[in-house]
Amino acid sequence: MSLDLTPTLSPARPLDSADAMEDRLREIGAARYHDRHPFHHLLHGGQLTRGQVQAWALNRYYYQCSIPVKDAVVISRFRDRATRVEWRHRLEDHDGAEGTEGGIDRWLVLTDALGLDRDYVEATDGILPATRFAVDAYVHFVRDQSPLEAIASCLTELFAPHIHAERISGMLAHYDFVNPTVMAYFQRRLSQAPRDADYALRYVREHARTPQERAAVCNALIFKTQVLWTQLDALHHAYVLGHVPPGAFVPEDMR
C-alpha cells in the first residue's frame, strides 16, 4: 500500500514523439488503472455487504470533494487565460453553480441512499488515514510539480468511462439499495470524463516537446494511478480483511 511520490519510468521505446508518448500513456492505463483492483471486482460483482459499500462511498467522498480543490490549484498554475477558462468548467462540474447541482451533490445522493448521515460524510472524520494521505498527496502534486505534470495527472480520465459504465450496470444488477437516481454521478461522468480527457491529452501532446517532458507526463499518470490504487488497497485491508484502524468508520455489519 506504498505511495511512491516520485515514480520513475524506463520506457521500452524512446519517447521521441507525441504518438510514442500517447501509446505509453495508454499502456500505463491498461496495466495500472484501478479498474483492475480486486476491491472494484468485488464492488461491481455484488460481493460486498451494504456496510462495505458504505465504507467505499464514505471514503470516496473525500476524493470527490477534493477534486475541485485540486482543479482550483491547477488553474492557479497558469498565466494564460485560455487554459484557465478551459479548466474552469471542472469546478462547476463538481461544485455545481447557483441553481444547479454538481458532482459532489450527486455523490451525497449516493451516501444518503446508503443510510450514511450527511453531516458525518461531509465532516470526513471517519475516513481511513490512507485515503486522506493519498488524496492530499494528489492536491500537493498538482501544486508542487510543473503545470504540465499537473494536467498530465488528470489523464486517468482517459480510462474512466469504462469503469463508470461497469459500475452502473454491476451495482444496479446486484444491490437492491441502488437505483438509477443513486447512480446519477457516474451517469453524468460518462459524458464529462471524455471531454476532460480529450483536452488534457491534446495539451500534453502539444506541450511535452522533449523526451524528458514526455517521460514526466507518463510519470504523472503513474503517480495518479498510485493515488487511486492506494485508496482501494486501504479499503480492502480495512473492510474486506477486517483491519479497520482506530477512529475510522465501522459499519453495523462489522460491529
UniProtKB/Swiss-Prot annotation:
Origin superkingdom: Bacteria
Annotated metabolic or biological route of this protein: Cofactor biosynthesis; pyrroloquinoline quinone biosynthesis
Name of the molecule in the record: Pyrroloquinoline-quinone synthase
EC number: 1.3.3.11
InterPro entries (alphabetical): Haem_Oase-like_multi-hlx, PqqC, PqqC-like, Thiaminase-2/PQQC
Function: Ring cyclization and eight-electron oxidation of 3a-(2-amino-2-carboxyethyl)-4,5-dioxo-4,5,6,7,8,9-hexahydroquinoline-7,9-dicarboxylic-acid to PQQ.
A Pfam family reported for this protein in Swiss-Prot or TrEMBL: TENA_THI-4
Coiled coil regions in record: none
UniProt-listed GO biological process terms: pyrroloquinoline quinone biosynthetic process; sulfur compound metabolic process
Recorded GO MF terms: pyrroloquinoline-quinone synthase activity
Family to which the UniProt record says this protein belongs: Belongs to the PqqC family.
UniProt keyword list: Oxidoreductase, PQQ biosynthesis
Annotated gene: pqqC
Organism: Cereibacter sphaeroides (strain ATCC 17025 / ATH 2.4.3) (Rhodobacter sphaeroides)
Catalytic reactions of this protein: 6-(2-amino-2-carboxyethyl)-7,8-dioxo-1,2,3,4,7,8-hexahydroquinoline-2,4-dicarboxylate + 3 O2 = pyrroloquinoline quinone + 2 H2O2 + 2 H2O + H(+)
Keyword set includes DNA damage: no
